[in-house]
Regions:
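A short alpha->loop->secondary-structure connector
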Residues: 73-74
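Conserved small/polar residues in nucleotide/adenosyl-binding loops
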Residues: 118-122
Length: 122
């Protein structure tokens, strides 16, 4: 059953010129159909260089956002639009705004594994 699904994915990605990027924590069945595997930043940088116009990110939301930020000319799809990272999503935008208001001479720094909504405020 899994092999049949993988075969269908391979056929569709070739037919639709899609590059599949998979974060290392994905299960083996997904890693086997991926064109590239790696950590989130390495995959986002790699997306800039692939010839495909469409990239399917098998990971969480911030990973797809980072791919789109670094490769704005690509159509970026997320394998599961509800896939989020609890750590990346625990930040509150109001907290960032409050810190910036209280400490205007300080610089807010956001890690790459942060939703773009918050990164843009840093």
């Amino acid at each position: 059953m899994i092999r049949d699904i993988q075969d269908e994915i391979m056929r569709l990605k070739k037919e639709n010129d899609v590059c599949i990027l998979a974060h290392l924590y994905q299960n083996d069945a997904i890693l086997e159909v991926a064109d590239y595997t790696g950590d989130s930043f390495a995959l986002a940088k790699l997306a800039q260089t692939v010839p495909n116009k469409t990239v399917l990110m098998c990971g969480v939301r911030f990973m797809a956002e980072t791919v789109k930020m670094l490769a704005p000319d690509k159509r970026v799809l997320l394998s599961n639009p509800d896939a989020g990272c609890p750590m990346a999503e625990q930040m509150d935008r109001a907290v960032i705004e409050q810190v910036k208001a209280n400490y205007p001479d300080y610089t807010v720094v956001a890690y790459i594994n942060t939703c773009l909504l918050y990164t843009s405020d840093a």
